[in-house]
Curated annotation (Swiss-Prot):
Region feature Disordered, mapped onto this chain: 317-338, 383-418
InterPro entries listed in its UniProt record: F-box-like_dom_sf (IPR036047), F-box_dom (IPR001810), Tubby-like_C (IPR025659), Tubby_C (IPR000007), Tubby_C_CS (IPR018066)
Residue span(s) of domain F-box: 54-109
Protein name listed in UniProt: Tubby-like F-box protein 7
Similarity annotation: Belongs to the TUB family.
Origin superkingdom: Eukaryota
Record organism: Oryza sativa subsp. japonica
PANTHER family: TUBBY-LIKE F-BOX PROTEIN 7 (PTHR16517:SF38), TUBBY-RELATED (PTHR16517)
Compositional bias ranges of the Low complexity kind: 383-417
Tissue specificity annotation: Ubiquitous.
């Protein structure tokens, strides 16, 4: 019996798990108030019942491990990789075995489960994606490339975002649901918010980073000067993990945009040899209604992490841009934590193309249309030289005309070579279609949110 027939067999035995309904119990309500039946956002309380009904749940661990390993190796790409996800949906035993067999994208370079969207990309390669823009609906959809052709629109849906213009800022709601893109949906995983000029952005994540305590303390400090009230909506965890700054073009000179990203959830040591990204999520668990109502009741009496993004004053941005690790951690014993700085990404230095008479970047065939939105980000050096800011390389941007990559201007060590590696590149290939390639230490969610900043209107950067 082939492994594919085994997968089909246990699928027929179980049926579709999504058709089951589960009841949500909300504490603090009387018996006449019953929770509504919801799908994937509820807890699977009847997992033992499913396991008893399955004839595959009692497989010996050695046999189950062999089946999972062979299936994971055979179905390495989408759409056939959905069989691996189906195996993880069988029961707790199969789910735990899949988690043990399927490695993170950092080591296998594959996106398998939804949590992979918030885990770092591969160290030894890139994950190629593309973004489709719908101007009429103000939506953006991220897909995983299933082909090497840049104009091939066949892809695996990953994330979606919807733009909402406010009086003083712009919001981009990011969701795993392609249709219901809102903060109330079960697929909501974060958002992007810009200031009025479109020069400063903050990326918010629903998953707490490793330094969530420090980020929350900074948010509470900045909110003391804000008089705006808490929105009476069901709150959702919101942690400011990234700040993106675009340099103002006061003189109005023609050229590409200059940007800098402060990754507050990623330490600068992550790109060094042997470095890691701490606090990687192992699963995406939606918040229960019980927790939401409890935190909504307490948010009116004290500052909460669920309402960070009401103030967009300059002092607030300076707090995030200056010190990412200040505050309560200074009271702790570990001095190493205080010395850890956030990873900073900047534009890669381009080279001058004599024939085109412009500054160019080598996108290796992944970008074909010249656009001010195109960019490549690399890790900023710990101690940048004084002349680096004066180079036109900070404004690096161009089409894909050249064939040779730019060479380093001076001899570099292994550490400097790590800082020359392109971590994220984004560029235009057709009307309303853009490519996005990312790698370690960024996740798909972080890379997508950074690319969304390039779509926003910038009144003082062009």
């Amino acid at each position: 019996m082939s492994f594919r027939s085994i997968v089909r067999d246990f699928r027929d035995s179980f049926g579709t798990l999504s058709k089951r309904s589960f009841e949500v119990k909300i504490s603090g309500f009387s018996g006449r108030h019953r929770g509504k039946s919801i799908g994937p956002s509820s807890e699977l309380d009847d997992t033992p019942v499913v396991a008893q009904q399955s004839k595959w749940a009692g497989l010996p661990p050695e046999l189950l491990r062999d089946v999972m390993k062979r299936l994971e190796e055979d179905d390495s790409n989408w759409p056939s990789r959905k069989d691996v996800v189906a195996c993880a949906s069988v029961c707790t035993t199969w789910r735990d075995m899949c988690k043990d067999i399927v490695r993170n994208p950092e080591f296998c370079g594959k996106l398998t489960f939804p949590v992979s969207l918030k885990q770092p990309g591969p160290r030894d390669g890139v994950i190629q994606c593309f973004i489709k823009r719908d101007k009429s609906k103000l939506t953006y959809h991220l897909y995983l490339c299933l082909s090497s052709a840049v104009l091939d629109e066949t892809g695996k849906f990953l994330l979606s975002a919807k733009r909402s213009r406010r009086t003083t800022h712009t919001d981009y709601i990011i969701s795993m649901d392609s249709k219901n893109i809102s903060r109330s949906s079960s697929g909501y995983i974060g958002k992007l918010r810009s200031n009025f000029l479109g020069t400063k952005f903050i990326i918010y994540d629903t998953q707490p980073p490793y330094n969530a305590r420090t980020l929350c303390s900074q948010e509470r400090t900045s909110r003391r000067f804000s008089s705006r009230k808490v929105s009476p909506k069901v709150p959702t965890g919101c942690y400011p993990i990234v700040q993106v700054n675009y340099e103002l073009n006061v003189l109005g000179t023609r050229g590409p945009r200059r940007m800098q990203c402060a990754m507050h959830s990623i330490p600068a040591s992550a790109v060094e040899p042997g470095g890691i990204v701490p606090g990687q999520p192992k699963e995406l668990l939606p918040r229960l209604f019980e927790e939401s109502f409890r935190s909504m009741a307490t948010s009116f009496s004290k500052y909460s992490i669920t309402d960070h993004s009401t103030d967009f004053s300059s002092s607030r941005f300076s707090e995030f841009g200056g010190g990412a690790l200040q505050g309560q951690e200074q009271e702790q014993d570990g001095d190493d934590v205080n010395k850890e700085r956030p990873l900073v990404l900047r534009n890669k230095a381009p080279r001058w193309h004599e024939q085109l008479q412009c500054w160019c970047l080598n996108f290796r065939g992944r970008v074909t249309v010249a656009s001010v939105k195109n960019f490549q980000l690399i890790a900023a050096a710990p101690q940048p030289s004084s002349g680096a800011a004066s180079e036109p390389s900070q404004a690096g941007q161009a089409a894909q005309q050249q064939t040779q990559p730019s060479q380093p201007s001076s001899s570099s060590s292994s550490s400097s070579s790590n800082h020359d590696t392109v971590i994220l590149q984004f560029g235009k290939v057709a009307k309303d279609m853009f490519t996005m390639d990312y790698r370690y230490p960024l996740s798909a969610f972080q890379a997508f949110a950074i690319c969304l900043t390039s779509f926003d209107t910038k009144l003082a950067c062009e």
